[in-house]
Amino acid sequence: MLEVAQKYLQLKSGEYYKCFGKVDKVVGLSIETIGPKAKLNDLCMIFLDKERRDYVMSEVVGFKDSHIILMPFDNVEGVGVGCIVENTGHPLTVAVGDELLGHTVDGIGRVTDCDEKDLELDSEYPIEAPPPDPMSREIISDVLPLGVKAVDGLITVGKGQRIGIFAGSGVGKSTLLGMFARNTKADINVIALIGERGREVREFIERDLGPEGMARSVVVVATSDKPALIRNKAAKTATSIAEYFRDKGEDVLLMMDSLTRFSMAQREIGLASGEPPVTRGYPPSVYSEMPKLLERAGRADKGSITGLYTVLVDGDDFNEPITDTARSILDGHIMLDRKLGHKNHYPAIDVLQSISRVMSAIATKEHKNLAGRLKNVLATYTEAEDLINIGAYKNGSNQDIDYAIQKIGAVNSFLCQGTDEKFSFEEELELLEKVFE
């Protein structure tokens, strides 16, 4: 009787038969198929045997003539010409819920450190989601303390702001993210580790993040050996998880390491689907996907997503395409300087080259005056540093330089901070004021 009812419902809905496709060609990262009927971003199953037991999940990334271009979420071992392809008819979603806190997931939201069935995940969020309407966004008006003196004092971040951390390799980006995750006043951390070395993931979770930070965090991991589609989706999965907590009224800190590797994954996808390479080999989709991702962060009527995105600067060239594009979209940038790291000045933040575009709107007048005075002292000393070091400057020649020499020790003391040091926002402002006593 049940079978009859199911057949009746199937006939009533017009689903008289199911369409399948077949693999026609496998080239590099992409799989070209003839059929089935599909839309962009639909999930498809590529079956590896006639019984249709084993399959590889893939996504529609483009169309070429009468062919569909798929990219797999796993390696393509076992996929060959003639394999049956079935369209699921829906795009990728991620299961979300409060019980995700304290856990790690992969690039498409599958829990990796326990059985997902043991967690009560009450909602499904689409991974590909549009940014909020500009007129529905709340204005950024509140400070979000991150617990690092140099940032809170001189590059103050607001709830809902998006800011980039720009640096070459090995300058301390991951360590700085760990400090933010442990010290921030945000309710929830969502951390995306994209294209990282496999050994660094556990090191970051146990050493940089620690039990204190992990307890209120969700970590999305897609290591460098994963397919380009997984690395690309990891950034969007992390943003979707952050959107879930924002919709619940939480203030979320979304940290992504790194935006550069997201763009590199998009480059692989774009080139494999037939896009032409343009600036430095990046296809046009890289420059359209980045703003789509970054614009999803921000304030809503109930909660906020504050985005911190690391950008790996290729060859320390701060004008290369990805760096330049990210800087133009974000609401500010924190520049890390390798030379400061060589002087054991950590975090190696170049505050003169860094800026928060919302600081003027959220900081008090007194705070802005103190930050301006410190930057003036640092700029004056930096300009005269070579003369001072070779002994060519004589005391009394310039009052501003004399004052900078007097205060530079206190300034550097304020800008440096140990990884285990923690300050409240009020304590940071007091320390900033003491620099000029």
How would you describe each model-predicted region?
Residues 11, 53-54, 92-96, 111-117, ...:
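Active-site phosphate-binding and catalytic loops of NTP-dependent enzymes
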